[in-house]
Amino acid sequence: MRIIMAVLLWMGAGGAWAAPLDTVFANIDGGTIEMSDFRGKPVLVVNTASQCGFTYQYDGLQALYDAYRDRGLVVLAVPSDDFNQELASAEAVKEFCALNFALDLPMADVSRVKGADAHPFYRAVRAETGFVPRWNFNKVLIAPDGAVAGSWGSNVKPRSPKITRQIEAMLP
């Protein structure tokens, strides 16, 4: 009985059995980003960092969002300091992105993406697929039904056909 109760408590606390679209991110601008609001749409979630060699991919993420947002694509940036390459505060991240990239895609507050303290979204992705970001600018595509449709490392650019083919297949 204690084991059953412990499992139920763990699940209720955002355990590994939560689905990716059942999670909530703090928004870098305040408030929250409810992943459930994106049900029925493809969502590309990318862990980002301001001081990384892949930071130039912000341009590609914005271009991807611009190309497909009217058809329903959501691109969500999740700043993270898990690889020691993010700025010291959410305010600094916002300022950096405003000065260097004309981003208007949704952005979460700085979050953990790996390890025991990973955000529940990343724990859910790991539970479903085994995928854990190994560096900044790793990408996870969530299908409109909420399943993980794909994941890619830093070297796969946002506008890569590997990603865009899957996105296009999910859009009206």
Predicted regions span which residues?
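Amphipathic alpha-helical repeat scaffolds
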Residues: 47-51
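Thiol-/selenol-based redox modules, centered on thioredoxin-like
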Residues: 120-172
